[in-house]
């Protein structure tokens, strides 16, 4: 059971709720803060105060005063009018993360909602009702309005949801789960959609998969190093200490550990003086990506515990309009994640080229083919890798430098953070397939060199991977192999092995 406080949620707890379906509860003290914030809203209404989104219109219509008899209708109207996102729906895992993050943000006690709103969010999480949320339509300020409106409508029994593996009207899902629809009161519709929980949810899952991929990439690269008689002097601790980047030091240390005892690696001057950069500069490049990912994690964990509503309602009755809904911090972090993971794929593709190119592969069969000429072997796998990394370069274009004014120029600068997060997730999927191709090629190459000459650690990894993909003995449909290996690399159980070995 994970207890949400509004202040302490971690990426690892997101992982447990999303993937392991761990149950969630609200901290009692945090709920008391929620009650105080709600009482402040109700007192302000009774005093006749004007508060944005409570008794006014929205966006450019903020100066339109709404009378008391229409205040609850205002909130459901807001959700209905804003629920105009388009495109394919987010995966259920992403929606689970949205529900979790929205509940945690409301528990900070600055949104003026009733505890019943948070209880509804947690009921959805714990019973497995996942609203249908289209992916496209957010500008990332005022938060993720359009997609979050779809999420919030389901709490009131409108829209659609996935429940027990079936897509159905949200009202039907609520009925089957024994949950009553939520009747929204003043401020609550706005509080449910004014925030960055879509970009942060997508970003958190992209980060979790990117972290896994970073560890995977080092193991795969270690096999390639052996297959190409790589020079291990480049990983000497003194080189990396002389520069000082901790992540670079760590990558070099892991490579030394994985390759310890190998009879395939060489020393400088034995076969050649220096390796190409895609081998020699592995710690520098992979380390830089790892350093970027750590910044991304830090940013996400701050945002996961942030109040991103507007206005914020304080316990003393103060209502302050600000801009915490602006997704720029997450947008920039997602753009950085895109670059970091795209680079892991870029350098992997260059190592693939060295494995299949007979002019670069130190005597390996051309394209790793059993019968070069009659059979093409891994030739087109390198094409696919090149295609994927080229697509990543397009996706890696920063979304955060783009902005289109909206709401009659009231919202004249936006973050495009959800676009950045969605593209980051796409890049991770593409990069995993590139690394799957490198692994398939590296497995074939080390076989040609002699697996008995491999390091004990890499040989263990070799045997694990060979359970997923067999040796290339004749041409076959390699897309099946690529997809199978990519799926294996994405498995969390496999990640635990690789990560734990990496951190040994």
Swiss-Prot record:
The keyword Lyase applies. Its EC number is 4.3.1.3. PANTHER family: HISTIDINE AMMONIA-LYASE (PTHR10362). Belongs to the PAL/histidase family. It catalyses: L-histidine = trans-urocanate + NH4(+). Pathway: Amino-acid degradation; L-histidine degradation into L-glutamate; N-formimidoyl-L-glutamate from L-histidine: step 1/3. Its main location: cytoplasm. It holds the Pfam family Lyase_aromatic. One of its GO terms (biological process) is L-histidine catabolic process to glutamate and formate. This is Histidine ammonia-lyase. The lineage of its organism: Bacteria, Bacillati, Bacillota, Bacilli, Bacillales. Contains an active site 4-methylidene-imidazol-5-one (MIO), which is formed autocatalytically by cyclization and dehydration of residues Ala-Ser-Gly. One of its GO terms (cellular component) is cytoplasm. It comes from Geobacillus kaustophilus (strain HTA426).
